């Protein structure tokens, strides 16, 4: 008898909303030269092919920084930098073109592989590269001639979209030609950023040395707003002044993410090229694995509606089974849905609370407080409480009270104090369950 993995089945089911959400969307992937050189490169290519097979339109932009440096060293050449940009003279341009050409062939070859007994078995991918990007020289800055280092002049988005619509993967590198027929060395992060903006991509994804932005505890920061990302850039620039990776790929991509976000790209993702499956975990799981730069938070606090009843019931059922919450039927929830506030993330209800006002006493009960077990390490309970406080004040309520059997200390930390049964509004006193012996706590607004 074959052993069937329930984890595999569960993973497929949980990823279904994301498969449906991402189908037909355009995503730009930044693949630095460090990622190509890493031993996880083959797995990254397999994951990109999987994305394509799920109906995602994929544009891959590759960098070649370490490969260029290796070739320069072999030829005993050095290239100066000005404002963290390589000055590309004639000799350096030849090396850059050689490195970029080799990487283009290597990536194309891996995407073309379809051997049996491999994740690419049966895959028939068309990889298209071309003069989609037109460059122009950076020129002279502070008396320094950048030579063949350039910037983007324009992008042929119509041609790229036609190629994507035909089912091909678009592959672009750091070399682009100009209207005069010259070649220029571009920053691959800038190429990826501008492609995402001009194509109206749904996502910009960058493979970095770390699993996104790392906090003081060594954990990836799940989400950053642009202004927060700017603060991170300032801190990283100061703390990693001698770290070449942070001063090139990671910081440049983070800067590009901010620009893309402010230009209308909904989300930019920073993930590690060292972690097997990071791309799939980031795109097809509830929590992701790296850092997102977003214009607005993926989590929303809002008033519940009739369509949220199923999600609320699913959230509170385990707590009802444990006796932490009083049971509520679907019918009761339908009648009281207007009193509920929820926290929603990517279509999943991860938190809820209800507010029952007693207008004559100018008091309100905060009840049915629940947070999804995977999200209890944040401040979402406090988020719901603050929302309830704001809502209570708007309804001319002076005090909020709760009945709890398990969360006494948390509520006391938020300023609640213990009161007796006689504190409760008359209508609530008659419903108090003396066998349950819930603690009653109040908060002055």
From Swiss-Prot:
Subcellular location per the Swiss-Prot or TrEMBL entry: Cytoplasm
Native source organism of the sequence: Vibrio parahaemolyticus serotype O3:K6 (strain RIMD 2210633)
Keywords: Acyltransferase, Amino-acid biosynthesis, Arginine biosynthesis, Cytoplasm, Transferase
Gene3D superfamilies, alphabetized: 3.40.630.30, Acetylglutamate kinase-like
Domain of life: Bacteria
Identification of the protein by name: Amino-acid acetyltransferase
Gene that produces this protein: argA
One term under GO cellular component: cytoplasm
EC number of the protein: 2.3.1.1
């Amino acid at each position: 008898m074959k052993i069937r993995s329930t984890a595999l089945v569960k993973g497929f089911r949980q990823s279904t909303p994301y498969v449906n959400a991402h189908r037909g969307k355009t995503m730009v992937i930044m693949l630095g030269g460090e990622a190509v050189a890493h031993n996880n490169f083959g797995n990254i290519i397999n994951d990109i092919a999987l994305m394509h097979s799920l109906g995602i339109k994929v544009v891959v932009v590759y960098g070649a920084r370490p490969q260029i440096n290796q070739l320069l060293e072999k030829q005993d050449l050095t290239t100066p930098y000005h404002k963290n940009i390589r000055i590309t003279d004639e000799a350096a341009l030849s090396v850059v073109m050689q490195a970029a050409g080799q990487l283009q062939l290597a990536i194309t070859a891996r995407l073309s592989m379809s051997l049996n007994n491999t994740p690419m078995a049966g895959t028939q991918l068309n990889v298209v590269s071309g003069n989609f990007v037109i460059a122009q020289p950076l020129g002279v800055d502070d008396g320094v001639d950048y030579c063949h280092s350039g910037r983007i002049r324009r992008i042929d988005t119509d041609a790229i979209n036609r190629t994507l619509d035909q089912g091909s993967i678009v592959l672009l590198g750091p070399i682009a030609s100009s209207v005069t027929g010259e070649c220029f060395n571009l920053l691959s992060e800038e190429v990826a950023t501008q492609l995402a903006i001009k194509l109206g991509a749904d996502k910009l994804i960058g493979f970095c040395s770390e699993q996104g932005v790392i906090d003081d505890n060594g954990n990836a920061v799940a989400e950053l707003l642009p202004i927060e990302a700017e603060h991170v850039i300032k801190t990283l620039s100061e703390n990693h002044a001698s770290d070449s990776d942070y001063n090139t790929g990671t910081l440049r991509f983070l800067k590009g993410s901010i620009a893309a976000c402010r230009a209308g790209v909904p989300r930019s993702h920073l993930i590690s090229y060292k972690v097997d499956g990071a791309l799939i975990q980031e795109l097809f799981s509830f929590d992701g694995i790296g850092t997102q730069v977003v214009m607005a938070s993926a989590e929303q606090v809002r008033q519940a509606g009739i369509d949220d009843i199923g999600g609320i019931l699913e959230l509170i059922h385990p707590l009802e089974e444990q006796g932490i919450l009083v049971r509520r039927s679907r019918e009761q929830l339908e009648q009281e849905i207007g009193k509920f506030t929820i926290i929603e993330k990517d279509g999943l209800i991860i938190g809820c609370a209800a507010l029952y006002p007693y207008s004559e006493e100018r008091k309100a009960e905060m009840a049915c407080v629940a947070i999804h077990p995977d999200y209890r390490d944040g401040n979402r309970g406090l988020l719901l409480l603050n929302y309830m406080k704001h809502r209570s004040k708007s309804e001319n309520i002076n005090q909020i009270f709760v009945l709890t059997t398990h969360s006494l200390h948390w509520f006391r930390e938020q300023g609640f104090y213990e009161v007796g049964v006689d504190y409760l509004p008359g209508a609530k006193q008659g419903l108090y369950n003396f066998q349950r012996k819930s603690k009653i706590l109040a908060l002055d607004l």
